[in-house]
Amino acid sequence: MNITSLQQNITRSWQIPFTNSSDSIVTVGDRNLTIDEVVNVARHGTQVRLTDNADVIRGVQASCDYINNAVETAQPIYGVTSGFGGMADVVISREQAAELQTNLIWFLKSGAGNKLSLADVRAAMLLRANSHLYGASGIRLELIQRIETFLNAGVTPHVYEFGSIGASGDLVPLSYITGALIGLDPSFTVDFDGKEMDAVTALSRLGLPKLQLQPKEGLAMMNGTSVMTGIAANCVYDAKVLLALTMGVHALAIQGLYGTNQSFHPFIHQCKPHPGQLWTADQMFSLLKDSSLVREELDGKHEYRGKDLIQDRYSLRCLAQFIGPIVDGVSEITKQIEVEMNSVTDNPLIDVENQVSYHGGNFLGQYVGVTMDRLRYYIGLLAKHIDVQIALLVSPEFSNGLPPSLVGNSDRKVNMGLKGLQISGNSIMPLLSFYGNSLADRFPTHAEQFNQNINSQGYISANLTRRSVDIFQNYMAIALMFGVQAVDLRTYKMKGHYDARTCLSPNTVQLYTAVCEVVGKPLTSVRPYIWNDNEQCLDEHIARISADIAGGGLIVQAVEHIFSSLKST
């Protein structure tokens, strides 16, 4: 397989065609969706079932009845008997109430840029259905059921990456989903189980008629944070996978550098008991346990080695203190995104019990904008930390005697080892750090006739986080390649052969062997991963590893124990 094909595979891993996974069912409407459930529906085709709770169904119908009565009695309600946004002073008659909703789709059909991944759109659809089942939106059950049908049949509307400022929700992106659901016009297109077609044809194949929106329904569908939150949910999941892999990379790097295990002694971290620091230290303690490639100093003694430092440099010694805040931050981000996932985010909201509606602002995606800004910042920190470890590995004066640039066959004088690979990584790390800059504070105050004069930029922030995650996967591939080569060379320096499996800790052997299998490296004691520069294509190896990570393959499975532990923090 050539490099182009491998890169296309990476792209397709986020454009996952519908694959029906009937092993489980995700029930929507009980207000307890998790990120894992969103990912299972979005990427793996897990079937969706709307709750059959009678109270929920009655609430949905009661909210519709309230809206219909309000229209009949000409009650002043935003977006139902009034115009939108800065034109909310326009009075809408009973005869125009339904047309207003359809017209909302048309004037919002203004997206630009590339299409979102199918997985991110599917996540958005799931969350929109979940929000509407609260019974505060004034939308028919039939329309919510249509979302369920689309998800279970693998019909995914095409949505564009630009168009939402995250203020009145994701108006423009959701207009594409709504237009496709009701079959408004052939210009709305979908992916139908891997095939592109217009939404009208898709409805026909599903045996569904076109739908005419009723009062409030267009606004209910388009006025909410579901798209940005769906993207965010997928990104949080991916970031946790990458954080687990980061721990594995550091464990390989520490063993490659012949670092000490003393830095992770429980006593140190009990003296500064931040939850994330404790978790990180405990995980690294476990990852390094029984390794022959670390200095065994858990007894508190310090091995003095002449000209070498008596203690490790900060990137090793302070690892738990550096990554700990990120672990705590990701845990908080997870909680906030899951609250947003299980919220009602349109406007106005209907209190059916008290027969009153309220004008509010739950559509503002500030929680998503701020959390995604934070997540990108954390990714930048993780990448910079790994970059420092790589710099130590390639420099003999800092690596405890490994060859320069981790050259495999030093007898072949033209070999430059992983010099080019480091440069490639150096080109990625600054970009990830740059992407860590915030967007939520860069909003236009004049948006939509100064009506949306504060806005979250949550949608763009979530999309940029998706980009950051994708790039970090490539960087992680590079880091893993360095880790494998380093432990091979360290094994040779200490044992006279290159089979690192005999020296690595039991908890890192699986990651090592997974990387070797993905890139096609023979497990041998005769040669390290990279022997001569001209015997492999490093770009193909980057692509193979990146694709494996994106698809949740062998490499991700090798750190499942870390990932599972991380999810419980």
Curated annotation (Swiss-Prot):
Compartments, record wording: Cytoplasm
TM helices/strands, residue ranges: none
E.C. no: 4.3.1.24
Keywords carried by this UniProt record: Cytoplasm, Lyase, Phenylalanine catabolism, Phenylpropanoid metabolism
Source organism superkingdom: Bacteria
Residue positions where 2,3-didehydroalanine (Ser) is found in the record: S168
Subunit (UniProt): Homotetramer.
Protein name: Phenylalanine ammonia-lyase
Organism of origin: Nostoc punctiforme (strain ATCC 29133 / PCC 73102)
